[in-house]
């Protein structure tokens, strides 16, 4: 297994807003350089350019719409976030759910603009369906565990291992991330042992009093 991929989602936490978005990204970059582990961040949309301009690491959008240029007031246009410095995007996070048609349209737009795409799912069947669309990653996150502090890798390990198995049968090129309740080194280790290639996490790092120390704890068993 290669080095895991870690994506830190800032959500709309005040600690990850504005200057805080840059400060946390700098902590991620430092830990990434020291460990050799790829760590990316997903700040709020208005902070994408700020973070991408000030810190050399992969920046993801928390959402994008499957639309093109034109009369789409309030939508998130893939070309715009790409030119702001985004490297990729989340699609269908449980806090920003989409219909199947919208997921497919967003993924198509992400590919059109050269953005790495992560489709979020909540169980094995939806993970299998997402894998059939061929994103770069699927991220399995049971919504009831998000922000709970209870890692999915312990609360429901079968949903992780089952997702990994389902994806490998449909398209082994699609990588699987594990999310929900991930915050400590044991959580990441368990997620990797279940076959995932990395994790999607948020509050355990963003809201920590010392995000750098929290990241160092997260990767200590890798």
Swiss-Prot record:
Similarity section: Belongs to the triosephosphate isomerase family.
MF term (GO), any: triose-phosphate isomerase activity
Classification via InterPro entries: Aldolase_TIM, TIM_sf, Triosephosphate_isomerase, Triosephosphate_isomerase_arc
Subunit and partners: Homotetramer; dimer of dimers.
SUPFAM superfamilies: Triosephosphate isomerase (TIM)
One GO CC term on file: cytoplasm
Originating organism: Methanosarcina mazei (strain ATCC BAA-159 / DSM 3647 / Goe1 / Go1 / JCM 11833 / OCM 88)
UniProt EC number: 5.3.1.1
Name used for this protein in its record: Triosephosphate isomerase
Biological role: Involved in the gluconeogenesis. Catalyzes stereospecifically the conversion of dihydroxyacetone phosphate (DHAP) to D-glyceraldehyde-3-phosphate (G3P).
Assigned keywords, A-Z: Cytoplasm, Gluconeogenesis, Glycolysis, Isomerase
Designated gene of the protein: tpiA
GO biological process, one term: glycolytic process
Catalytic residues (UniProt): 93, 141
Binding site for substrate: 9-11, 146, 181, 202-203
Enzyme class, broadest EC rank: isomerase
Pathway: Carbohydrate biosynthesis; gluconeogenesis; Carbohydrate degradation; glycolysis; D-glyceraldehyde 3-phosphate from glycerone phosphate: step 1/1
Catalytic activity: D-glyceraldehyde 3-phosphate = dihydroxyacetone phosphate
Disulfide bonds: none
Presence of keyword Cell division: no
Cited Pfam families: TIM
């Amino acid at each position: 297994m290669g080095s895991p991929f870690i994506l830190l989602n800032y959500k709309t936490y005040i600690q990850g807003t504005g200057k805080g978005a840059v400060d946390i990204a700098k902590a991620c970059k430092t830990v990434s350089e020291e460990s050799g582990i790829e760590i990316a961040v997903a700040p709020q949309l208005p902070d994408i350019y700020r973070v991408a301009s000030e810190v050399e690491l992969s920046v993801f959008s928390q959402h994008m719409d499957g639309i093109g240029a034109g009369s789409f007031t309030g939508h998130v246009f893939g070309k715009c976030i790409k030119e702001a410095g985004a490297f990729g995007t989340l699609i269908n996070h449980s806090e920003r759910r989409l219909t199947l048609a919208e997921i497919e349209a967003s993924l198509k737009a992400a590919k059109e603009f050269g953005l790495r795409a992560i489709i979020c799912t909540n169980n094995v069947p939806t993970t299998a369906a997402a894998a059939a669309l061929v994103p770069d990653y699927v991220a399995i996150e049971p919504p009831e565990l998000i922000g709970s502090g209870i890692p999915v890798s312990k609360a429901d390990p079968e949903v992780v291992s089952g997702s990994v198995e389902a994806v490998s049968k449909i398209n082994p090129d699609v990588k699987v991330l594990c999310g929900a309740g991930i915050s400590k080194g044991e959580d990441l280790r368990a997620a990797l042992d279940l076959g995932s290639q990395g994790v999607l996490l948020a509050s355990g790092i963003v809201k920590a009093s010392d995000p750098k120390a929290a990241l160092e704890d997260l990767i200590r068993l890798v």
